[in-house]
Curated annotation (Swiss-Prot):
Its main location: cytoplasm. InterPro entries: Hid-1/Ecm30 (IPR026705). Changing G187D: In DEE105; uncertain significance. Residues 297-316, 571-681 are annotated as: Disordered. It is a lipid-anchor. The gene is HID1. One of its GO terms (cellular component) is Golgi medial cisterna. Belongs to the hid-1 family. This is Protein HID1. Expressed in heart, skeletal muscle, colon, spleen, kidney, liver, small intestine and lung. Highest expression is seen in brain and placenta. Loss of expression is seen in some breast, cervical, hepatocellular, lung, thyroid, gastric and renal cell-cancer lines. Highly expressed in secretory cell lines. Expressed in almost all regions of the brain, in cerebellum, anterior frontal cortex, and striatum.
Length: 788
């Protein structure tokens, strides 16, 4: 009954606030206390009892009352942080104010006129803590709020375990408390694992949700093309002003990486006990990736003096960016810390793949997209971590889940962002030689995927999944094709033995991409052929010995290479090819690719359910902007190549078939000549046809085809195994052109990808926060909300 009464009183207070036309004095505590002192309303109650329309009405019609509500709520949080929340009543007030601000903040952010409100000063809230009355020293409301949240996240008996055993009199003084002793979870820089406490976890979660809502002002600003714009909320929270920056960074990172959703491995455990840890871990992951939203391409920012107390951070390194969270992340350097982080992320990413004989017996986590963003940030900001990941075959524990997600999401338009981040991570990894070498490890674990069964290595798995994405994904994935093939090019010089299934897939892609209608239907399509020829050349020149399957497939499909060498360039043939294009709506033919049986236990990739919400994404930069070319020297070191001057599309192809203009998200796979913008000419075809790198393959065919034909005639053979045996023991030493230098296209940070990551990350956070629906139905500007 008490709960119903308090809800009723709370609702009455809301109605009073919305109907009062006169400003209510800030000193009228009897009125304001109705919102937090007497109630025990859950966050769901607050969202139900404070409708969006009423918040907007107060904002428009009695703005001073909304301003006072926010000011008073922040004041209560500051008081709670100052006092240390010793009584249950104080704790309840802090939680109620936190929920109310979480509800109201998005409506402050959506109105440009209100955007500066939290950054205006409140008289008497002095920076020096002396309560100076002069406004010059007054702290903006946003700063007071953020510092109070930080203090409250390390408040003994509220969000952390108290270390004192004695009476209330000697309760820990919140000002002298060293929060590094109260880190939430063992892991990086902290060995002690505190006892799990359900109440503390729930309180942390509420405060983190408010913190995330503070940071979400970014959602209400349109994506700016060269956006170096820093989020003022994140900038202040991650600065030296926040004395809890290090322990909070460590707490968030350790909470995520130490989480084990399977618990003690008891089947159906999650059905018996509600897992209160997962919501906290999700919230921690989301707050962490937002605090790390920092454009590494422009990180030549002023530096801090590196004043950290944690030994886990590398003090030998020069101080990093002003954002302390990025700074701390970039300075983690101990092997055991890297191992803890990598094992934790791999365990969580692999969780949705867990197949057991008992259906639904293990808990499946839902925050894999946040984990992928976190993994990306770790690799991008901490090169030592990237090298650690690639040092052993542990990198494959990250690769397999990513390939699973890519394959699973390929038909679902609402998961285009997931496809992009998975491919971006693999592009980043593929720029390192060790990644290609690691792919030669046999693939034995059988994750049920909707792909043909094969026996081979992790390289086979990668190529088979990429083939599936290209041939049976939806059309919005076409901008990713050159990224996918760049990854294959980067690893190709190191692939020791591809399976027959994989060899056939690569030849099928070449066959599909080299049809005249595909080559002539868009200005960039021929680049895909260049990439595939580069793959074949790398394997023939550097890994011929173990790759008899691929050599045999090339011999069998030799007509494709002859057709490319004799590609017609006359106007009638070009016109005829384009006519055929208009009659062929399929982006790629799947004929000629033997699908074979799919893996046991797999389910086909399904399109999104109609009506599924998705958020729009900004276009990604083209592969030429995403990567820079490096040449591998004889000693294995990389030498960066000067970018060659780009020619315009009219006067020919870019150097070596390199994509010269971004393949934009908006670009449809249909012919662009229909809109009158571009149509292929004989000169254009000749300009790149003359650069097709066919010499190595033609020489191989010239040497091997007569020998293979002779074996077949002499022995009356139709058996592949005999031919493969011959190819395995054959050699082309001295018969092929001099090996070309290995070219690697390494990912390079740029403002375009930084903006893409920002929109993707906030889109994920928007869609994942449905209970309560923090941002739903507010006027966000960073992306559009669409229905599939």
């Amino acid at each position: 009954m008490g709960s119903t009464d308090s809800k009723l009183n709370f609702r009455k207070a809301v109605i009073q606030l919305t109907t009062k036309t006169q400003p209510v004095e800030a000193t009228d505590d009897a009125f304001w206390d109705q919102f937090w002192a007497d109630t025990a309303t859950s966050v769901q109650d607050v969202f139900a009892l404070v409708p969006a329309a009423e918040i907007r009405a107060v904002r428009e019609e009695s703005p001073s009352n909304l301003a006072t509500l926010c000011y008073k709520a922040v004041e209560k949080l500051v008081q709670g942080a100052e006092s240390g929340c010793h009584s249950e009543k104080e704790k309840q007030i802090v939680l109620n104010c936190s929920r109310l601000l979480t509800r109201v903040l998005p409506y402050i952010f959506e109105d440009p006129d209100w955007r500066g409100f939290f950054w205006s000063t409140v008289p008497g809230a002095g920076r020096g803590g002396q309560g100076e009355e002069d406004d010059e020293h007054a702290r903006p409301l946003a700063e007071s709020l953020l510092l109070a949240i930080a203090d409250l996240l390390f408040c003994p008996d509220f969000t952390v375990q108290s270390h004192r055993r004695s009476t209330v009199d000697s309760a820990e003084d919140v000002h002298s408390l060293d929060s590094c002793e109260y880190i939430w979870e063992a892991g990086v820089g902290f060995a002690h694992s505190p006892q799990p406490n359900y109440i503390h976890d729930m309180n942390r979660m509420e405060l983190l949700k408010l913190l995330l809502t503070c940071f979400s002002e970014a959602m209400y600003l349109p994506p700016a093309p060269e956006s170096g714009s820093t989020n003022p909320w994140v900038q202040f929270f991650c600065s030296t002003e926040n004395r809890h920056a290090l322990p909070l960074f460590t707490s968030l990172l350790n909470t995520v990486c130490a989480y084990d959703p399977v618990g003690y491995g008891i089947p159906y455990n999650h059905l018996l006990f509600s897992d209160y840890r997962e919501p906290l871990v999700e919230e921690a992951a989301q707050v962490l990736i937002v605090t790390l939203d920092h454009d590494s391409a422009s990180s030549a920012s002023p530096t801090v003096d590196g004043t950290t107390t944690g030994t886990a951070m590398d003090d030998a390194d020069p101080p990093g960016p002003e954002n302390l969270f990025v700074n701390y992340l970039s300075r983690i350097h101990r092997e055991e810390d890297f191992q803890f982080i990598l094992k934790g992320i791999a365990r969580l990413l692999s969780n949705p793949l867990l197949q057991t004989y008992l259906p639904n017996s293990t808990k499946k986590i839902q925050f894999h997209q946040e984990l992928l963003v976190l993994f990306w940030k770790l690799c991008d900001f901490n090169k030592k971590f990237l090298f650690f990941v690639l040092k052993s075959s542990d990198v494959l524990d990250i690769l397999v889940p990513i390939l699973f997600f890519l394959n699973d999401a390929r038909a679902d338009q609402s998961r285009v962002g997931l496809m992009h981040i998975g491919v971006f991570i693999l592009l980043l990894l593929s720029g390192e030689r060790n990644f290609g070498v690691r792919l030669n490890k046999p693939y034995s674990i059988r994750v049920p995927m909707d792909i043909p069964v094969f026996t081979g290595t992790h390289a086979d798995l990668l190529i088979v999944v990429f083939h599936k994405i290209i041939t049976s994904g939806h059309q919005r994935l076409q901008p990713l094709f050159d990224c996918l093939l760049t990854i294959v090019v980067n690893v190709s010089p190191y692939l020791k033995s591809l399976s027959m299934v994989t060899a056939n897939k690569l030849l099928h892609l070449l066959e599909a991409f080299s049809t005249t209608w595909f080559l002539f239907s868009a200005a960039q399509n021929h680049h895909l052929v260049f990439f595939l020829l580069e793959v074949f050349n790398n394997i023939i020149q550097y890994q011929f010995d173990g790759n008899s399957n691929l050599v045999y497939a090339i011999i069998r499909k030799r007509s494709i290479f002859h057709q490319l060498a004799n590609l017609p360039t006359d106007p009638p043939t070009i016109h005829k090819a384009l006519q055929r294009r208009r009659r062929t709506p399929e982006p790629l033919s799947r004929t000629g690719s033997q699908e074979g049986t799919s893996m046991e236990g797999s389910r086909p990739a399904a399109p999104a359910e109609p009506g599924t919400l998705k958020t729009s994404l900004v276009a990604t930069p083209g592969i030429d902007k995403l990567t820079e070319k490096s040449q591998v020297s004889e000693d294995g070191t990389l030498r960066s190549l000067e970018p060659e001057p780009q020619q315009s599309l009219e006067d020919g192809s870019p150097a070596k078939g390199e994509p010269s203009q971004a393949w934009r998200e908006q670009r449809r796979p249909s012919t662009s000549s229909a809109s009158g913008q571009w149509s292929p000419t004989p000169e254009w075809v000749l300009s790149w046809k003359s650069k097709l790198p066919l010499q190595t393959i033609m020489r191989l065919l010239q040497v091997l085809v007569p020998q293979v034909e002779k074996i077949c005639i002499d022995k009356g053979l139709t058996d592949e195994s005999e031919i493969l045996r011959f190819l395995q023991h054959g050699t082309l030493v001295g018969l092929l052109p001099v090996p070309h230098p290995i070219l690697i296209r390494k990912y390079q940070a740029n403002s375009g990808t930084a903006m893409w990551f920002r929109t993707y990350m906030w889109g994920v956070i928007y869609l994942r926060n449905v209970d309560p629906p923090v941002w739903y139905d507010t006027d966000v500007k960073l992306f559009e909300i669409q229905r599939v």
